[in-house]
Amino acid sequence: MPAAPDYPSAPDLVAPKRALLSVSDKTGLVDAAKILHAAGVELVSTGGTKAAIAAAGVPVKDVSDLTGFPEMMDGRVKTLHPVVHGGLLGVRDAADHAKAMADHGIGGIDILYVNLYPFEATVAKGGSYAECVENIDIGGPAMIRSAAKNHGYVAVCTDPSDLAEVLEALKAGGTTLALRQQLAARAYARTAAYDAAISAWFAEALGQDFPARKSIAGTLRQTMRYGENPHQKAAFYTFPNPRPGVATATQLQGKELSYNNINDTDAAFELIAEFDPAAGPAVAIIKHANPCGVAVGATQREAYERALACDPTSAFGGIVAVNSRLTREAAEAMVEIFTEVVIAPEADEDAIAVFAAKKNLRLLVTGGLPDALSTGDTFKSVAGGFLVQSRDDARIKASDLKIVTQRQPTEEEVRDMLFAFTVGKHVKSNAIVYARAGQTLGVGAGQMNRKDSARIAALRAADFGLDLKGCACASEAFFPFADGLIQAAEAGATAIIQPGGSMRDPEVIEAADKLGLTMAFTGVRVFRH
């Protein structure tokens, strides 16, 4: 490990004399170049960046004029040179550095503005392997890291907003050490995220589900007043190219989203994505990341009213998600009780107008539904590390069911079982869902044993006058004993859907036959913790 040299303290104020600009995103470039030139800053640039500046009539040198080397190898080598990196890394007030710079004709570079080749965008648009590789920037990250390391003297900018701060600082005579430190921190965060994106792409391209090293990179979207509880700090970061959901949503009205709002809204929207809008309107109401009512209907308003009927008490202060464009009629029903968030792919203008009277209600539109079968990873932090798993993309169809009882289900019972199991996939384990005709009637969530979940779900239905006779009962994991199934049958369920796979399956099947139930095994467990 290199020892830390005894360098002189960095100056608080640096009046820049030279800037190197090399950008792929040229937003605001010419205006910035004009301001720098007017401030007496010499401009050095490369390729297309230089051409854009020169075309505007602003004096600019080519980096080759400094290095004495032309760009070569299709532009792969242009700034990887001691004159460039010496100009970025040289400690101006260290005598030996100053001598080396003088001996080798190296001038200091006080401002570096680089934004990197659009690797992430190339991947997002489905670029070929060769295109993605060619859009891996080498010289840019190298310069950024050099400049950021020497932030005692160099202001490094990786985004137009960074450069805007530097230009503003010039009005006061130069960049301060505090600003340069902030810019350096952002620069290293940018190169870290860039390398993480490259690493993730290579792992996927090579079919490596779990590479030896895995990085998670996100962009700060929002800093929150507090986290899950008031004594916890929190922020919201988004991944590159996120799928439709909270991360892509535009907030049309309401207070700032809280940590719990985002967590619950994500759960609601992931659930509602299970329901194809082409099959009709569907609505989910979520509380503490658990569904308290889910339903389909002939209209969106009907779907909402049926979902609300499952547990109107828990729906108070909940999250509502819809799978289709939000309508005025549905919005009018939603504002009748206190709701924290409504999230939809789109919203009619007259629906938005209905919510305007509820200024605290947060209305989000995402621009689309996520693909419930899309690939990707989910993460969970544990002490000292994090767990990674592929997204739960289980989708059960009628043809997947194995009927294990003597009685075969009716077509209506099959539909009810599939609906209940789809909802159960989004209920915290142990989970029991009673449903009939595209409507949840009772949800039992998060209990330590399955019998209690079945009992609580039935109590919920009774509390709100919902008759469970002839309903379907879904369990997200197998019944380890017959007691949970018996509990469901006593509540009124006649059709049971569960994964199967218990060593006591024969005992459970026997109990179902004695009770005259029909039961289907899915062969797929959908735990949720």
UniProtKB/Swiss-Prot annotation:
Transmembrane segments: none annotated. Its EC number is 2.1.2.3, 3.5.4.10. One of its GO terms (biological process) is 'de novo' IMP biosynthetic process. Residues 8-158 form the MGS-like domain. Pathway: Purine metabolism; IMP biosynthesis via de novo pathway; 5-formamido-1-(5-phospho-D-ribosyl)imidazole-4-carboxamide from 5-amino-1-(5-phospho-D-ribosyl)imidazole-4-carboxamide (10-formyl THF route): step 1/1; Purine metabolism; IMP biosynthesis via de novo pathway; IMP from 5-formamido-1-(5-phospho-D-ribosyl)imidazole-4-carboxamide: step 1/1. InterPro entries: AICAR_Tfase_dup_dom_sf, Cytidine_deaminase-like, MGS-like_dom, MGS-like_dom_sf, PurH-like. One of its GO terms (molecular function) is IMP cyclohydrolase activity. It catalyses: (6R)-10-formyltetrahydrofolate + 5-amino-1-(5-phospho-beta-D-ribosyl)imidazole-4-carboxamide = 5-formamido-1-(5-phospho-D-ribosyl)imidazole-4-carboxamide + (6S)-5,6,7,8-tetrahydrofolate; IMP + H2O = 5-formamido-1-(5-phospho-D-ribosyl)imidazole-4-carboxamide. Keywords: Hydrolase, Multifunctional enzyme, Purine biosynthesis, Transferase. It holds the Pfam family AICARFT_IMPCHas. SUPFAM superfamilies: Cytidine deaminase-like (SSF53927), Methylglyoxal synthase-like (SSF52335). Gene3D superfamilies: 3.40.140.20, Methylglyoxal synthase-like domain. GO terms for cellular component: cytosol. The IMP cyclohydrolase activity resides in the N-terminal region. Belongs to the PurH family. This is Bifunctional purine biosynthesis protein PurH.
